[in-house]
Amino acid sequence: MKTLTIATPAYLHNGLLVATLAALSFLLLAARPPWLFSGVTFTVIGCGGVLFALLFVVSASQRSQGLDLAKSYLRLALVVWWALLISEEVFYRHTPEAESFAGHFSEAAYGEAAYWAVAFLALLLMIRPQYLRQAFSGSNKWLALFALLCLISAPFSPTPLYSLAWAFKLFLAVLLLVLCSATINDLDDIESFFWSAFWGFVILSVVPAVRAFVNPSGVFDKGRLWGSPNDLSLCAGTLVVLALLLNSLRKRTWLVGFVIVGTTVMIMSGGKAGIIAGIASVTLFYVLQKRLAAVFGWLLAVLVLGGIILLATPLATHFISYQERDQLSTFTGRTELWKAAWPDILQRPIVGHGYLASRFLSEHVEGAFGEAGHMHNGFLEALYNNGLIGLIILVAIHLLIVKNLWRALKGPRDRNAQLLAVGSSAIYVNLLINGLFNATYGGRASAPFMLLLGLLVVSEKLRGMTDQSDGLTR
């Protein structure tokens, strides 16, 4: 097993970080942006304090347990990974497309960017030279290439500041995944990765639902849970699969509660792609285990719960309205959006319009519906923003995940390895289906896209362990 070593004196490394932090703080105080002394600033400070407190607690527990260096780095990296997953929910806001295009961002947006910088600082404290050498080895190179492409293309988008900020988050997420790739050595490490993702999606699913129920203007908006119903259905469906996977591994009965909560939120949100993907992915989770009775039980439970929700909430009015307006034929206007954006794609087919240029489709593309926000398809999202280069890299990531998981599923019958491969496959199908109708991948470094990129690392590790076990049995 490879170990990570320190190539420079610790005092020099830490001193450089302190000097950099001091310089950035001085520049920030000199600029005196209006949000500096607002409530958002205190939120950033508070969240940063929580992050470093968690890192301290995890580090202290590792010393007491006598863990090896690789596991220590992995646990610390997963804390930062979790913090990055939930950052959008901590700094929740809704900025109209026109305001973003004009460069008018909310204080919460600046706060979230500052929080990413805090997470990056935490990562810098863990960086070791040998870990960075793996950035362009194996499957990691596809992650690194996509992140670098987005970073390079960001200045060419209609709003470079917006695109650069999100490219920075994507770059940070890839750095964390490279560190995870360098430190994941067994099935327990992969399970730890999914525990980190689980607690992230708990926040991403439960907090928006609670926010909707305390919303003074009403719990429902046009028949669906108030907020971002498409995103919420996706996150809740992902939570269900993660809870089922971890419960299968560890038999934690309380995880069943999160399955129920996740399924309820998934249906109440009314995101049609999210509901279909959630039902299909859980069904696949049981089918791959040949648990046909569980398949029928799951489908029956969804049918009963869905019926209760339709009777007890205004959700039925949303589906009735959807049918009356004949939106099924255009997938809620998506096909019309794709047709309208296609000429723009052909203008720059190789390099695209710049990372996250699709955020402003309604401002640039004639025929795009208002507040489109993205291409509503992950592959078209990459094609519009980063051209064929970005699309090829994204397709390569998908193909490698499928190839790795297929090999892991066909490998030796180690129970936990099989469950992790089955769970990873179900999560992938959930994200894949959603991404056909939303920008689940290929665009912003949101939690679902981060999880998809993480599946590339996990699937490669599962395949490597499968190949190793297969070699030992011959």
Predicted regions and their residues:
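Interfacial loop-to-transmembrane-helix boundary motif in multi-pass membrane proteins
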Residues: 64-82, 132-148, 158-171, 179-206
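Structural signal for the C-terminal ends of transmembrane alpha-helices
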Residues: 52-66, 121-133, 179-188, 243-250, ...
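Transmembrane alpha-helices of multi-pass inner-membrane enzymes
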Residues: 17-31, 39-57, 241, 423-474
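Hydrophobic transmembrane alpha-helices and their immediate junctions
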Residues: 11-13, 182, 296-297, 388-429, ...
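A membrane-periplasm/extracellular boundary helix in multi-pass inner-membrane enzymes
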Residues: 27-39, 206-215, 264, 268-269, ...
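N-terminal signal-anchor transmembrane segment
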Residues: 3-125, 152-156, 431
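Long extracytoplasmic/lumenal interhelical loops at the membrane interface
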Residues: 316-339, 343-347, 351-386, 407-410
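Alpha-helical transmembrane segments of multi-pass inner-membrane proteins
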Residues: 2, 12-28, 116-124, 144-155, ...
